[in-house]
């Protein structure tokens, strides 16, 4: 069965170049509450939410060759190659029928950003960063018991190390361009969403 990454010809599988699409990247350490807050934004502001992690896990469940490779990488706390993640995101956006997207957990490094911009031809309207201390992130992940293979303390620490080394430079990049919107994610979910709500009401 063909997957989004089987493409022999890049041009045939590029994202549509929507001129009026609004894309918001949502970044934060593992356990920072990105998914919960994205669901709130979807409810109140009519965005379509895509989690890079959820799309990768769906590919794993499909039983494809790439799914097995993704599973191994996630278990080791490594970042999946950009081409795979971007093509999964492009396919999801193309099938959504919407033109307002929250992309959660992406880009995770400079390569992700370059591949997305080159394929999708879209720059984010802004980048939402949920800032939260490592100790709080570990506590949240260990207490949520979602049955995910990547929710054990060693893998959590690996994921946070990857986040610090690879994603914080991306956050600095967007901050230098005036596109970063930082939220204190150590507060309660309700307090965090109030800050998010005010932000989206002013930005969109």
Curated annotation (Swiss-Prot):
Source organism phylogeny: Eukaryota, Viridiplantae, Streptophyta, Embryophyta, Tracheophyta
Record-listed ATP binding positions: 31-36, 144, 187
Protein name listed in UniProt: Probable UMP-CMP kinase 1
Leader sequence residues: none
Alphabetical list of PROSITE patterns matching this protein: ADENYLATE_KINASE (PS00113)
Family of this protein: Belongs to the adenylate kinase family. UMP-CMP kinase subfamily.
Gene coding for it: UMK1
Subunit structure: Monomer.
Cofactor note: Binds 1 Mg(2+) ion per monomer.
Stated role: Catalyzes the phosphorylation of pyrimidine nucleoside monophosphates at the expense of ATP. Plays an important role in de novo pyrimidine nucleotide biosynthesis. Has preference for UMP and CMP as phosphate acceptors.
Keywords of the record: ATP-binding, Cytoplasm, Kinase, Nucleotide-binding, Nucleus, Pyrimidine biosynthesis, Transferase
PANTHER family: NUCLEOTIDE KINASE
Family matches, as NCBIfam families: UMP_CMP_kin_fam
């Amino acid at each position: 069965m063909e997957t989004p990454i089987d493409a022999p010809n890049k041009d045939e599988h590029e994202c549509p170049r929507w001129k009026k699409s609004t894309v918001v990247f949502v970044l934060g350490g593992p356990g920072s509450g990105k998914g919960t807050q994205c669901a709130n934004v979807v409810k109140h502001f009519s965005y379509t939410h895509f989690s890079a992690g959820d799309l990768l896990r769906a590919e794993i469940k499909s039983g494809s060759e790439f799914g097995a490779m993704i599973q191994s990488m996630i278990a080791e706390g490594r970042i999946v190659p950009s081409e795979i993640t971007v093509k999964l995101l492009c396919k999801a956006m193309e099938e959504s029928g919407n033109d307002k997207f929250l992309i959660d957990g992406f880009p995770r490094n400079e390569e992700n950003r370059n591949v997305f911009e080159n394929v999708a031809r879209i720059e984010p309207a802004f980048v939402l960063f949920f800032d939260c201390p490592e100790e709080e992130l570990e506590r949240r992940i260990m207490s949520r018991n979602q049955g995910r293979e990547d929710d054990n303390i060693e893998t959590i620490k690996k994921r946070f190390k990857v986040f610090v080394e690879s994603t914080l430079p991306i956050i600095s990049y967007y901050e230098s361009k005036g596109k970063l919107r930082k939220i204190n994610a150590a507060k309660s979910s309700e307090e965090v969403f109030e800050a998010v709500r005010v932000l989206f009401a002013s930005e969109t």
